[in-house]
A protein has these predicted regions:
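Conserved catalytic phosphorylation-site environment of P-type ATPases
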Residues: 1-59
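A generic structural motif
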Residues: 26, 115, 149-150
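ATP-binding catalytic core of ATPases
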Residues: 33-96, 180-182
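ATP-binding glycine-rich phosphate-binding loop
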Residues: 91-101, 115, 127-128
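Conserved ATP-binding TGD loop and adjacent catalytic N/P-domain core of P-type ATPases
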Residues: 106, 143-232
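Flexible loop/N-cap segments at domain edges
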Residues: 140
Length: 232
């Protein structure tokens, strides 16, 4: 086990490793919330275009649930008590340029980064200043903008530094359309030099991390990237 661990030069890292969910926050930290319970992904607001807000949220939740997105519990919190219906997504497709689309009740619903939308020639507001916004279209028309914010965790920063110091390369198995090497560099103020495979490889690796593997080489008693970094 020790030999296998010390020989490891790469480690698969998921969305949850980089930005632990904890208690996901809709509008940031509330005064009476303990800091330890806060997550590192926030939904700070949304703007809806030419859609009923309930309909837009139902479309977004259906796609995010099918994609295994970290935004799903945030959207469910937002819908709780306001939107009584749920939709299901079919024919999910992922794209290399940072987006996903699917079919929901016969409509083509797409969600992705600003870059993804520009590649699809979707007109976005000119005064928009959101590095990690998530945009949604329905049948090719802008339907909603979600202000998503990623908050860097000190433990994750330490873990990334430990991996680099020990010459272990992170392999990103991320589903989030905005979780890229550039985002990590901005948020954690270091170049972790991760490997960023194509979308099909990232999804396959993410699925593998959720499955039981072969004979374990170590037991890790705490969740998160830092205990794993300390082990390898």
């Amino acid at each position: 086990g020790v030999r296998a661990i010390t020989a490891a030069r790469r480690v698969v890292v998921t969305d949850e490793d980089l930005f632990p969910a904890g208690v996901l926050s809709l509008h940031g930290k509330e005064k009476n919330e303990p800091s330890a319970a806060l997550g590192t992904v926030e939904l700070n607001g949304l703007k809806v275009y030419d859609q009923e807000i309930g309909e837009a949220l139902a479309y977004a939740e259906a796609l995010c649930r099918a994609a295994g997105s970290q935004l799903t519990p945030l959207l469910l919190q937002l819908m709780d008590g306001q939107v009584s219906f749920r939709y299901d997504a079919h024919d999910l497709h992922y794209y290399e340029d940072g987006g996903i689309d699917c079919t929901v009740r016969g409509a083509t619903v797409a969600m992705g980064s600003a870059y993804f939308m520009k590649k699809r020639r979707i007109a976005l507001p000119r005064d928009l200043k959101m590095e990690t916004g998530v945009f949604m279209t329905v049948d090719g028309r802008l339907a909603a903008i979600f202000a998503v914010k990623y908050l860097p965790s000190r433990n994750v920063e330490w873990a990334l530094r430990a991996l680099r110091r020990n010459r272990v390369t992170p392999v990103l198995a991320t589903r989030g359309v905005n979780i890229t090497p550039n985002l990590l560099k901005r948020k954690f103020r270091l170049n972790a030099r991760p490997i960023y495979p194509g979308v099909a490889t990232r999804l396959a690796l993410a699925d593998l991390t959720a499955q039981p593997g072969e004979t374990p080489n170590a037991l890790i008693y705490r969740d998160g990237l830092l205990p794993m970094a300390e082990t390898v």
